[in-house]
């Protein structure tokens, strides 16, 4: 029979129908090829927004730099970066006046953090520009390489293990006349194979020393590498994002710590909290505006959009903010915090890999590296690329571009939020001194503005004043993309508000399903996603039960583990049937071994192994939880793992799930082809670094809770720990005298070797 779809919505309030408008099925778009073009776009746009500024030349690097600050006053309707320092400082002063002591307290908190942060903080994060190799690396490797180079150049403050001491080395390194680095390279030789007598190419990996003079080192230290942002939906064009190097990262971390502490105490800030906590915070602001507006007043909300937020921000403005926020603090603290914005005022952007050229016949392909863009004849390029390159040429130095204005994506989210909130704060009646007033929410570049006034003219005047006040600090509200509704309906950071925040469950749809890590993790992540959506996103019990059944079905098809008594034939069904038949307690078999599903919406919080443990045959338990199983390269057993889940919109979220390591927690082996390339040396370094860290954790099992503090090296710490443990074990009779003597001997040998080295 035909069903009229409108009947479905008869009893549903309009706001609950939002989940039916979900446009994002299928995979998001990914970028291919180089990001060079996108980076050039960013650089050219950024300079265009600030074009009336003053040009100067950096005395150290020779880079031309554009400074739009305190230049011409901004104009209506045109996005620009012409912020005025005195306006920013005044906004800061008013923010402090409305929140007495907020800056002071945040400074004290940050000082404490600075004293305690270890350098391994910088190993968090993914890709990082590694200045020693001039390309991207995992954060831990990039840090290890930087420290290694620092030490070989006589910079040793970092050995204390404190981040602040590593940063002292960074500052010192910038004064050095030259820095010596080790680079990996690859030699190819044609040799005759003894067995087959054919000529083969033999590759060897070499390391060579290279000296960088002060200018080249400074350029590298100030470089941000660029990549294309992947998986962005709803955009026609891709855009570039930046990965800073190790010299910048530590300083940025401390600035963001300070700004985060301030944001935590600003009711209009949507950062650093998230999820339900964020919704509660935002609902408060709306409630306040609704309650404080008199019955005669009108209240409107703007769902705001800013034009090119970070391309119009300016590091010099951030420097002014920090100078003001820390004005009564000790000199060292002010210096540490002002370095990040100063480095950003002098930053260089790497153009990435360059351009690919193909001949008409498609036989030949060649890559034009970014370094060649200064000298290459432009007749090879199409019209639009030619324009880009012509614009960018004056700014090019060795394949990097001088980019003084602008911030690049995602660098100072917290601090820029403080700037945004400081303008929202000026909407109080005591500052507007008229009949209209405003308040709102700010989260990085996203904002919602609530304006109250006695009549429509007042609302318009309020919005205009807000718009122009923003202009003075380099924030450009987009008149085209912002829209106004009666207060009670707006959108902010993908949360839709209609008399309360609406659960938009469809946003979470992409995270349902099988992740493809391994059988154990996938089962755990799948049920955790359903559980979390029941808690946070109004996923009802009936729908959750259905989601669970669909997930189990999906899981069984993915891993071909249909129940042992099924008729479905797959590659695995022969083995699974055999297991089914010889198992006494069939309910104890995991789903991935062809067992039945015991999950329902009441027990989603229990890992499957625990759920079925009492039901398992003894020999099955022994096989399942056997750390010595030779076929499984085991993960370290941690009680909680983190999965990255992708909502349809917005950033990837980290989600915790319980992990019980079994013989199903396998890790796929690495692709071998990397071993024949020049990356191999890098890979070996990475593995060695990993091994050292793992060994260290073995000696200090609690090191995940409290790192050993002190100046001693990792080796010394492990040796002294081994001696203490051995003595305790010997005195309590756990080990024999001979074993004790042997351990002591090994410890002495290690120390002896260290002395000789």
From Swiss-Prot:
InterPro entries: RNA-dir_pol_NSvirus, RNA_pol_PB1_influenza. Residues 249-256 are annotated as: Promoter-binding site. Residues 50-82 are annotated as: Disordered. GO terms for cellular component: host cell cytoplasm; host cell nucleus. RNA-dependent RNA polymerase which is responsible for replication and transcription of virus RNA segments. The transcription of viral mRNAs occurs by a unique mechanism called cap-snatching. 5' methylated caps of cellular mRNAs are cleaved after 10-13 nucleotides by PA. In turn, these short capped RNAs are used as primers by PB1 for transcription of viral mRNAs. During virus replication, PB1 initiates RNA synthesis and copy vRNA into complementary RNA (cRNA) which in turn serves as a template for the production of more vRNAs. Belongs to the influenza viruses polymerase PB1 family. This is RNA-directed RNA polymerase catalytic subunit. The lineage of its organism: Viruses, Riboviria, Orthornavirae, Negarnaviricota, Polyploviricotina.
